[in-house]
Amino acid sequence: GLGALIFARHPALHSLALISLFGIVAVVLVSYTVQPVLFRMLVSSQTEKGGAPYTLGSLINTLYAFGLFVTGCQLLQALIFTLWPLPMARRRKQRIVQWSIHHMTRGFLRAMVTTKTIRLNDTGETFAEPAVVIANHQSFIDILVLLSICPKAVMVTNGWVWRSPVFGRIVRYLGFYHAADGYERLAPALAQKVAEGYSVIVFPEGTRSADGRIKRFHKGAFYLAAELGLDILPICLYGNGMISSKRQPI
């Protein structure tokens, strides 16, 4: 082919042959190095875990959602910093931040224009009275959904939520509780929050389900309901694990 023209003595043909040979070598290198790595990273590594392969659209949606979420967290931290020197009770400051989170999470979910959200509330629950709110746990998004539904609530969380560099400070400021402290020790502290009108959000499975199926419920939420004298308010979440799961967070 054109590569053979490298032996030609004509300068133009010699240059053309060199370019064609370099092109062939580049194509071979990409085919056996870059392309398999990208296929492994974007397709096979995800399908082996039971997830969907990454696409350009899914990556754009992820960056969009993550950007909105991080921006919201930064605004909340700025709000906390602004409220810090003001001469008002910490309880009132927490309530302002809680109200802001409730409306920001509602706005965040509405901004996810590629995801359809359906809420079924046949009983007309208003979440006005304190209760132990329990839900199945498929995704990190579950936390945002429940905070958007419950206008006044504290949550019992796992360690990774408590220590998150993005929103851990907000969680700690609001007085959310670490499940590792033990529900027996949490009950007296939560009683004070309940007296202030807060509900308590608990994921009885203890962690996110990797396959979307509801796992065994632990007894902590039910212990709290009995100790605090609260009704148990169950919420069933469906589809969040298809957007962001434990196996495939993005």
What residue ranges belong to the model's regions?
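Residue-level preference for the first positions of well-ordered beta-strands
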Residues: 130-132, 197-203
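Catalytic core of membrane glycerolipid acyltransferases/transacylases, capturing the structured
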Residues: 77-100, 127-182
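Membrane-embedded transmembrane helical bundles of large multi-pass transporters/channels
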Residues: 1-53
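Membrane-anchoring hydrophobic helices of lipid-metabolizing enzymes
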Residues: 51-131
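Hydrophobic alpha-helical transmembrane segments in multi-pass membrane proteins
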Residues: 1-2, 27, 31, 73-77, ...
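A cross-family acyltransferase "interaction/gating" segment
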Residues: 166-168, 198-201, 210-250
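A membrane-cytosol interface segment of integral membrane proteins
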Residues: 172-194, 199
